[in-house]
Structure formats: C-alpha cells, structure tokens
From Swiss-Prot:
Organism: Escherichia coli O6:H1 (strain CFT073 / ATCC 700928 / UPEC)
Protein name per Swiss-Prot or TrEMBL: HTH-type transcriptional regulator YidZ
DNA-binding region boundaries: 25-44
Keyword Nucleotide-binding attached: no
Gene3D superfamilies the UniProt entry points to: Periplasmic binding protein-like II (3.40.190.10), Winged helix-like DNA-binding domain superfamily/Winged helix DNA-binding domain (1.10.10.10)
Listed PROSITE patterns: HTH_LYSR
Keyword Transcription: yes
InterPro entries to which the protein is assigned, alphabetical: LysR-type_TF (IPR050389), LysR_subst-bd (IPR005119), Tscrpt_reg_HTH_LysR (IPR000847), Tscrpt_reg_YidZ (IPR023746), WH-like_DNA-bd_sf (IPR036388), WH_DNA-bd_sf (IPR036390), YidZ_PBP2 (IPR037402)
Length: 319
C-alpha cells in the first residue's frame, strides 16, 4: 500500500540527502550538528520506511543501493525546491553553509578576494573551501564533494580534455577562451633573437603536470610538425612555472595562459609574454576554454546558481 508523506518526518529526507553526499554517518552528523547515533537512528527509520537498506558498508564508506541511486536525482531536486522556498533575502543565513570549489591556480587566486567578499556579504556565516583542480576533480563534483569546478579544457582534436568528453552528468558554461603565451624573464637571451619555432625549441621548457600528464595540446601540435621541446622541469601549477621562469640567469621558458598577466600584475614578476610561434590553424588547436563545471543535480540549487552567476560576473572582463 502506498505510504503517505504525512507520516514521514521530512527531516529524515535531509538526513538521507547528506548521507548520499557524505557517504559517512559521522560526516553527515557533523553537518547536521547532531551525534552519529542520531543519524544512525534516522537511517534505521528511513530503511523501515523504504523497506530497503539504502546504504551498505564498503571500504570507501557507505555505498548506496540501487534503490538509493534511483532516488538520488529526485531527492536532490526536492531539496533544491525546498531551498528555493527558504532562500529569501530577509531570512536568517543558514549556519554551516559551505562553498566548496575546485579551481585551476592561479585562475581563482586572481579573483579569490573579490569572490570571498561577495560570498560573505550574502552569507556572513559561510565557510569557503578551495582545492586545486586535479585529475580527481570531476569525480569529486560527481560525488558531491565539490560544488563547482573552474578549469581550462582543451581544443586539440586528439585531446582527452575536450568539452565533448565531459561525463554526461556534468553541466558546464564557458566563461572565456584563452590562447597560452610563452613567458620568459625580461633579460632572457631569446629576446635578442628572431622569435620563431627554432628559437622557441632551442631553450629548455617548464611543463605543467596536468591531470597526471606532463604533455598537452602544445606537444601534440609539435608532434604534428615533427618537432619536440626539451622539458627540463615539470611542476604542478602555473604560478610555480612563472616564478621559476622569472629567476635571474634562468634560461627556462614557461608556457601559461594569457590571463596570467593579471597574476603577474599582482605579484610584479619580471616577465615578458610572447605569442606561441605557430600559424592560425595551429593556434586554434591550442585554445583553452575556461569553464565552470557542476553536476546536473545542482542545476537548480539556489546556492550554486548564485555562485555560478557571481563567478561569471567577476570574470566578465576576461571574456
């Protein structure tokens, strides 16, 4: 017989949503500001209501049953609609609200101060957690550990990082596109030579280890030309490559997005930017669409919709 929602404590659905996000009784309890024992009792009531275990223990935490997986989207939408009713300007800001972002650095650092101010103006008691974008970030968005990702994708047809290769569960919006530049110190000897492909390849390069790979579209384009660069150093972040390229008597070249000019202005690094020595068709393959990414279940989540629009407005000048 069909059960009536009037006999269900709706707080249990919030508990169920948090268990789905956290995959942990302890973590869900912390977010609800209750004891793990209280969450366990709520889970027992939910299991009785749905006549299903809902979650089973696994080495990685709670693993949802097929029934729980089938309810995930509907539950998320129900919670989002509930939040829409509660997210009114004159209502008290919810305690414990978190904004969890995964972003390419220094992309986020350029606007982090402005973004944090806007978040705290609207949600004074919120907390912000920022992690570097890495090979696991898309999975973190899918698992509900990250609200929004902000990162560059690639345009080369053979790249694994194409927008068209994103998982079906991920929605996205391109905020701006960028073509990388070559960054070198202001007194680098290459500045006294003709700037062409031979000069570019004559000097040692700094590579960025991107999603567990030391090569990217630039290396694909060079391979098509039968050429190869000498990678003398591999670093995890663009700002580290810029710092190293700026060191006195350093012959290293860094290839990094054009937007890094804003980062350089903030930190006053003695660097010059030169265009990559390729023709227009090759440059097109090196375009990097900088993209906001989120899970489809959060497409109408008011917190995340607001965060997306706020980030979009902050980076509008770079479009």
């Amino acid at each position: 017989m069909k059960k009536s929602i009037t006999t269900l404590d709706l707080n249990l659905l919030l508990c169920l949503q948090l268990l789905m996000q956290e995959r942990s009784v302890t973590k869900a309890a912390k977010r609800m500001n209750v004891t793990p024992s209280a969450v366990s009792k709520s889970l027992a009531k939910l299991r009785a209501w749905f006549d299903d275990p809902l979650f089973v223990n696994s080495p990685l935490g709670l693993s949802p049953t097929p029934l729980m997986v089938s309810m995930e989207q509907n539950l998320a939408e129900w919670m989002q609609m509930s939040n829409l009713l509660l997210d009114k300007p004159h209502h008290q800001t919810p305690r414990g609200l978190k904004f969890e972002l995964a972003a390419e650095s220094p992309l986020m650092m350029i606007m982090l101060n402005a973004l944090s101010k806007r978040i705290y103006q609207r949600y004074p008691q919120a907390t912000i957690k920022l992690r570097n974008w890495d090979y696991d970030s898309l999975d973190a968005i899918t698992r509900g550990e990250v609200d929004i990702g902000f990162s560059g994708r690639e345009s080369h047809p053979r790249s694994r990082e194409l927008l068209s290769s994103l998982p079906l569960a991920i929605d996205y919006e391109v905020l701006f596109s960028d073509v990388p530049c070559v960054w070198l110190r202001k007194d680098h000897p290459a500045l006294h030579e003709a700037w062409n492909l031979d000069t570019f390849l004559r000097y040692p390069h700094i590579s960025i280890c991107w999603e567990q790979s030391d090569t990217w579209a630039l290396d694909n384009v060079l391979q098509e030309l039968g050429r190869e660069r000498t990678i003398a150093m591999s670093l995890p972040e663009f700002e580290q490559s810029l710092f190293m390229a700026a060191q006195p008597d350093n012959l290293l070249l860094a290839t990094a997005p054009r937007y890094c000019q804003y980062y350089n202005q903030l930190h006053q690094l003695p660097l010059v930017a030169l265009p990559l020595p390729f023709d227009e068709s090759q440059q097109k393959k090196l375009e990097v669409p900088f993209t906001l990414l989120w899970h489809k279940r959060n497409s109408r989540n008011p917190k995340i919709v607001w965060l997306r629009e706020t980030i979009k407005n902050l980076y509008a000048s770079m479009a």
